[in-house]
Amino acid sequence: MSKPRKQQKCKTCGHTQFDVNRYTAAGDVSCLRCGTVLEENPIVSEVQFGESSSGAAMVQGAMVGADQARATFAGGRQNAMESREQTLSNGKRKIKRIAAALKIPDYIAEAAGEWFRLALTLNFVQGRRSNNVLATCLYVACRKERTHHMLIDFSSRLQISVYSLGATFLKMVKALHITSLPLADPSLFIQHFVEKLDFKDKATKVAKDAVKLAHRMAADWIHEGRRPAGIAGACVLLAARMNNFRRSHAEIVAVSHVGEETLQRRLNEFKKTKAGTLSVKSFREVENLESSNPPSFEKNRAMELKISKKLQQQQTDNFEDLSKMTEEEKQSVFGKLSKEEAQKQLLMNTILSDITITTENLNDQMDRILKMKKSSLENSLYKTPYELALANGSEQDPSKIWNINKPKNLVANLPKTDDILQNVSSEVELNSDDDDEIVLESKLTEEEVAIKERIWTGLNHDYLVEQEKKRLKQEADELTGNTSKSSSGNRRKRNKSSLPAELRKELGDIDLDEDGTPRSAADSAKMYISKTSVSKKINYDSLKGLLGGNMGF
């Protein structure tokens, strides 16, 4: 039984009877006793129905979604929608079409539609092809549900590049912060590949063996860092051979969409494991088998062993060659080394050559090396004069020892600057680097100089001919006496000063001393004005009386 509705009371007088003004659009609610207005412009949240002009029932009002910017009204355009809603509707319709073509369930297509809605909200769709985004949303939904669909399936169906689709997928995972995306398990693709290869009634058995092979490869670290399609293809090929089905590499490649070389590489990696050495019966019966090292580890280990063997063989060959050398040949080989370094080199070659060495010889050599190191270290350490005196057995006053070692007449014995400059030649020695190997290699021979001159003459032939014509014409004019002054000589020289002629005349001559300096301040002002241009900012009338009218204005 529902509870009775609580009766509304006036907040001022507590009266329970109210009047609703139905004659205005506001619909105010007021108390009948005190006249207090309780509600102004009340909003009715219940659904109301009306009648259209044709008599059909219609709902009054409009629904506004959480992701909508405004309400949609059926006014001039029937069923008017926003551009965002149209994009979302078209995207979901295309997703369902792609899902139907690839036999993807409807619930996965609906999940892909929600992923597309999220991508649209974060503006991930802008600037990208719609097919790439739609296929990526479907692939993310398939990965979430752990289906057997691959990116290349969407690529072949939509006729787009698988690399472009993969790049869009990686960017979408980063933009939408998809962190809980599970890794693709190779066993998910095995059933799909088996169905395409048509194993008939033994399809279940082949799939079971292939799944067990995939788990074995995962235990042997072959699955890490590899494409799951390549692992699944190799497992299906091995399972087919285990059940006496002849399937070629080309058939597996056509189904799994991986390269034949990749497929063979997975088979070679499985061959090097402990499970690869078992028979078919033993492999099916064994359960707990020790896992092998990763293929990359074995590859690096083999490379390291190969390098170490090569180095050891090289050291052995060097020692054999050294043992066959005479003393003169050894001296030429170790001539650049000091005596101690040569002995160390011989000792190291002896040790690395695996020749039997007695313990006494080895200890003697080590003691000798340690003594040499100790003596060199002692000699290299700095000792004060007082310590040297104590080492010599004489105990003197330390201050006297320091005074003995103090330099005397240091400044007086230093060479003078003139003595040093006398040893420095003031002439430039152009041939000082003639004996340098780099300079000698840079110099050209006579044949190279002739070739270079011939090339330069050919490149500048027109210029040389023109200069020769000018020279011959000038000589002919001089012989005939048809010489005229240059146009530059006839030109009137431009005055350096821009003073008017009248002003220069009023200035008069400038009295100069023997060294060319003006004798008075007036002459200095005249010189300055005559050299500089006329300035509009100088009042020349007041400049006349500045020096008592001696300027000549």
Swiss-Prot record:
<feature type="compositionally biased region" description="Low complexity">
    <location>
        <begin position="480"/>
        <end position="489"/>
    </location>
</feature>
<dbReference type="Pfam" id="PF08271">
    <property type="entry name" value="Zn_Ribbon_TF"/>
</dbReference>
<dbReference type="GO" id="GO:0001006">
    <property type="term" value="F:RNA polymerase III type 3 promoter sequence-specific DNA binding"/>
</dbReference>
<feature type="region of interest" description="Disordered">
    <location>
        <begin position="473"/>
        <end position="523"/>
    </location>
</feature>
<dbReference type="GO" id="GO:0000126">
    <property type="term" value="C:transcription factor TFIIIB complex"/>
</dbReference>
<feature type="binding site">
    <location>
        <position position="13"/>
    </location>
    <ligand>
        <name>Zn(2+)</name>
    </ligand>
</feature>
<keyword id="KW-0863">Zinc-finger</keyword>
<keyword id="KW-0539">Nucleus</keyword>
<dbReference type="GO" id="GO:0006359">
    <property type="term" value="P:regulation of transcription by RNA polymerase III"/>
</dbReference>
<dbReference type="InterPro" id="IPR013150">
    <property type="entry name" value="TFIIB_cyclin"/>
</dbReference>
<feature type="repeat" description="2">
    <location>
        <begin position="193"/>
        <end position="272"/>
    </location>
</feature>
<dbReference type="InterPro" id="IPR023486">
    <property type="entry name" value="TFIIB_CS"/>
</dbReference>
<dbReference type="GO" id="GO:0006352">
    <property type="term" value="P:DNA-templated transcription initiation"/>
</dbReference>
<comment type="function">
    <text>General activator of RNA polymerase III transcription. Interacts with TBP. Binds to Pol III subunit C34 and to the TAU135 component of TFIIIC.</text>
</comment>
<keyword id="KW-0010">Activator</keyword>
<dbReference type="GO" id="GO:0005634">
    <property type="term" value="C:nucleus"/>
</dbReference>
<comment type="similarity">
    <text>Belongs to the TFIIB family.</text>
</comment>
<protein>
    <recommendedName>
        <fullName>Transcription factor IIIB 70 kDa subunit</fullName>
    </recommendedName>
</protein>
<keyword id="KW-0805">Transcription regulation</keyword>
<dbReference type="GO" id="GO:0017025">
    <property type="term" value="F:TBP-class protein binding"/>
</dbReference>
<keyword id="KW-0479">Metal-binding</keyword>
<feature type="region of interest" description="Interaction with TBP">
    <location>
        <begin position="281"/>
        <end position="553"/>
    </location>
</feature>
<dbReference type="GO" id="GO:0000995">
    <property type="term" value="F:RNA polymerase III general transcription initiation factor activity"/>
</dbReference>
<dbReference type="Pfam" id="PF07741">
    <property type="entry name" value="BRF1"/>
</dbReference>
<feature type="binding site">
    <location>
        <position position="10"/>
    </location>
    <ligand>
        <name>Zn(2+)</name>
    </ligand>
</feature>
<dbReference type="InterPro" id="IPR013137">
    <property type="entry name" value="Znf_TFIIB"/>
</dbReference>
<dbReference type="GO" id="GO:0000994">
    <property type="term" value="F:RNA polymerase III core binding"/>
</dbReference>
<feature type="zinc finger region" description="TFIIB-type">
    <location>
        <begin position="6"/>
        <end position="39"/>
    </location>
</feature>
<comment type="subunit">
    <text>TFIIIB comprises the TATA-binding protein (TBP), the B-related factor (BRF) and a 70 kDa polypeptide.</text>
</comment>
<dbReference type="InterPro" id="IPR013763">
    <property type="entry name" value="Cyclin-like_dom"/>
</dbReference>
<keyword id="KW-0804">Transcription</keyword>
<dbReference type="InterPro" id="IPR036915">
    <property type="entry name" value="Cyclin-like_sf"/>
</dbReference>
<dbReference type="InterPro" id="IPR011665">
    <property type="entry name" value="BRF1_TBP-bd_dom"/>
</dbReference>
<feature type="binding site">
    <location>
        <position position="31"/>
    </location>
    <ligand>
        <name>Zn(2+)</name>
    </ligand>
</feature>
<dbReference type="GO" id="GO:0097550">
    <property type="term" value="C:transcription preinitiation complex"/>
</dbReference>
<feature type="repeat" description="1">
    <location>
        <begin position="98"/>
        <end position="174"/>
    </location>
</feature>
<dbReference type="Pfam" id="PF00382">
    <property type="entry name" value="TFIIB"/>
</dbReference>
<dbReference type="GO" id="GO:0001112">
    <property type="term" value="P:DNA-templated transcription open complex formation"/>
</dbReference>
<keyword id="KW-0677">Repeat</keyword>
<dbReference type="GO" id="GO:0001156">
    <property type="term" value="F:TFIIIC-class transcription factor complex binding"/>
</dbReference>
<dbReference type="InterPro" id="IPR000812">
    <property type="entry name" value="TFIIB"/>
</dbReference>
<dbReference type="GO" id="GO:0006383">
    <property type="term" value="P:transcription by RNA polymerase III"/>
</dbReference>
